[in-house]
Amino acid sequence: ASDVYKRQGVHLTHRQLASADSLTVAGLVRLSTVDWPGHMVSTIFLQGCPWNCVYCHNPDLIDCRTPGIMAWADVETFLRRRQGLLDGVVFTGGEPTRQRGLHDAMERAHALGFQVGLHTMGVYPTLLRPLLPLIDWVGFDIKAAPAHYSSIIATDPRSSIGTVGSRHAMESLD
């Protein structure tokens, strides 16, 4: 199953962390009151998702080869101007944990005084685990009951990715 993810360009561990400057930023919501309940945040959308859910509301974020629309340096400059005005930063996607620069970006957001939130599907429990000490809140996107993952996320019904995806999401909940 990990070969499926490797073919999609995913590194399964954070052994080779990258700089936040390597992030492919697909969008920035400057002020959100809905992405983290009870908090005023900025939401950063990261490009790339291993799944193609039938009801995806961000289909433009699926292809990890799509270039970003802004550099992390621009995001960081924006966040510096919002210090004391926002409660936090939420990283979302796509699936943000697939980007190796996420760890550094979260550290930088904390260094600026922001709380850090994460929206994830839990598809990469081995990538999520080392991020947990940096995360103040998680919005966990369970796609379906485990038996129905294949019908929601798999592009090829013969693929085992639905079973693997369900198992990984449930493992991430632990």
Regions found by a protein language model. Give the residues of each.
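Short, small-residue-biased leader/transition segments that mark boundaries at the very start
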Residues: 1-5
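Extreme N-terminal tail/first-helix region
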Residues: 9-23, 67
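Pocket-edge positions in alpha/beta enzyme catalytic cores
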Residues: 17, 64-67, 154-161
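Short, charged low-complexity linear segments at domain edges
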Residues: 17-40
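Canonical Radical SAM [4Fe-4S] cluster-binding loop centered on the CxxxCxxC motif
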Residues: 34, 38-71
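Conserved alpha-helical substructure of the radical SAM core
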Residues: 59-89
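Conserved AdoMet/S-adenosylmethionine-binding subsite of the radical SAM
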Residues: 76-88, 97-174
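Short glycine-centered, acidic/aromatic-flanked micro-motifs in structured strand/loop junctions
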Residues: 93
